[in-house]
Structure formats: structure tokens, C-alpha cells
């Protein structure tokens, strides 16, 4: 009998990003497993988003890491074999997780960088919350693969972050938010980018290849697909 795929643990932050990641896992796995409705075992744990938001707002990444580690321990106790976190911003806490987590993680920016190389992109525009875009989460992983990147102008960062935090994470998708992201991505295209990183797991809820001025790298779905592959490789 073939071994079962590895049990995937999801460390959730916002409900919208975690739900999209989980839904992608469950809907795309059957095609790889060759069996209707089949997917690896999945467990999810999430602390209150308010707890994460409080830490992020005061720039307390150690506090973010402690929340993530608590989720990691609970998922490990429940049988998960490796972890994913469908939230780009809190990947800034990864430097405080190293050597302390009970399980290995797939890093969302590493997954996106690998896909950019596979598709032949060379210069990526970054979108996401203001904390993520200002951080080294993506530049560090992109530089390791010889990729260039462009950050939006400050005003664009702040408006995109406002839309994410006030609208998208609350399940609201106003058309003016779509237009704002399209305009920001258009300016990244003018700056020479050949693709855009949807570096917030809620952005794919309003932006896709169908309405983006640039090809998109959907961090949420790419992470879910990488988790499926990892689960199958470890079986």
C-alpha cells in the first residue's frame, strides 16, 4: 500500500488568506492524487487576528513569532508533519522562529521566487501591506535567485495597505480597491517590472492575470500548491 501524503499544518493569520489557501489545497490536490475529492490531511490553527495586528502595529515581531510558534506546537501535537503560513507580512518573524519550531516550514517568498525563475521573470514588482513591502522578506529570497525587484512609491504602499487592512481582511472587495491596485501595478510595469508579486494573501481575491497590467505571482495559491507537492514527495 502506498504511503499517505504528509499531514499539512496551516498557521493562519487572517481568515480570508487562510481560507483561500485551504480551499486551493482541497480543490487542486485531487488532480495530483488522481482521485476525486482527495487531498492530504490538513489541520489549521489560528490565533485571533487582533492579537497579530496588535503585535504588528507596535513592530513586535518577537510577539508575532511567539503566536506562530504556539500554533506550530499545537499543529505538531495534532500530527502535522510540516507547516505553511498563508500570510506574507508575518513572515518577518521567521528570523525568530529558526531553531525553535517543532516542524519545518515552507517559506512563502521562497516558493514565489522559485516560480518566478521557472516562468522566466527577471524584475518583480512587490505589492502587499506597508510592513511587508518595506521589509526584506521578498528582496532576500529574490536576490538569492538573481532576481530584481521594485517597491511601489510610499503613497501607493500606504493606500494598498489601507485597502488590505480595512477592506480585504474583512471580506469586503470594493471596486475602487481593484482600480487602485491596477493603477499601482501599472506604475510598476512602467518601472520595468515584468511580473508582480501579490505579496498579501488577500490580494488574489481582487487581482488576477485577468485584470492585472502585469502577469501575477499569486503567493497564496503558489504556497498551497507547493504544500501539496511537499506532502506527496514525503509520502
Pin down the residues of each PLM region.
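Non-catalytic structural scaffold of enzyme domains
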Residues: 1-235
Amino acid at each position: 500500500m502506498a504511503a499517505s501524503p504528509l499531514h499539512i499544518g496551516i498557521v493562519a493569520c487572517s481568515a480570508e488568506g487562510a481560507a483561500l489557501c485551504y480551499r486551493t489545497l482541497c480543490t487542486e490536490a485531487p488532480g495530483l492524487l488522481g482521485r476525486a475529492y482527495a487531498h492530504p490531511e490538513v489541520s489549521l490553527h489560528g490565533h485571533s487576528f487582533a492579537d497579530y495586528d496588535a503585535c504588528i502595529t507596535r513592530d513586535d515581531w518577537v510577539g508575532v513569532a511567539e503566536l506562530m510558534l504556539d500554533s506550530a506546537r499545537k499543529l505538531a501535537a495534532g500530527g502535522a508533519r510540516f507547516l505553511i503560513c498563508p500570510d506574507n507580512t508575518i513572515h518577518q518573524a521567521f528570523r525568530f522562529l529558526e531553531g525553535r519550531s517543532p516542524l519545518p516550514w515552507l517559506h512563502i517568498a521562497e516558493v514565489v521566487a522559485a516560480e518566478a525563475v521557472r516562468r522566466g521573470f527577471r524584475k518583480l514588482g512587490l505589492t502587499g501591506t506597508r510592513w511587508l513591502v518595506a521589509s526584506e522578506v521578498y528582496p532576500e529570497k529574490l536576490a538569492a535567485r538573481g532576481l530584481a525587484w521594485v517597491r511601489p512609491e510610499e503613497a501607493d504602499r500606504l493606500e494598498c495597505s489601507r485597502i488590505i487592512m480595512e477592506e480585504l481582511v474583512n471580506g469586503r472587495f470594493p471596486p475602487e480597491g481593484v482600480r487602485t491596485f491596477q493603477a499601482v501595478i501599472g506604475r510598476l510595469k512602467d518601472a520595468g517590472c515584468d511580473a508582480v508579486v501579490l505579496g498579501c494573501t488577500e490580494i488574489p481575491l481582487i487581482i488576477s492575470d485577468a485584470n492585472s497590467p502585469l502577469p501575477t505571482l499569486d503567493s497564496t495559491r503558489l504556497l498551497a500548491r507547493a504544500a501539496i507537492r511537499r506532502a506527496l514527495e514525503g509520502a
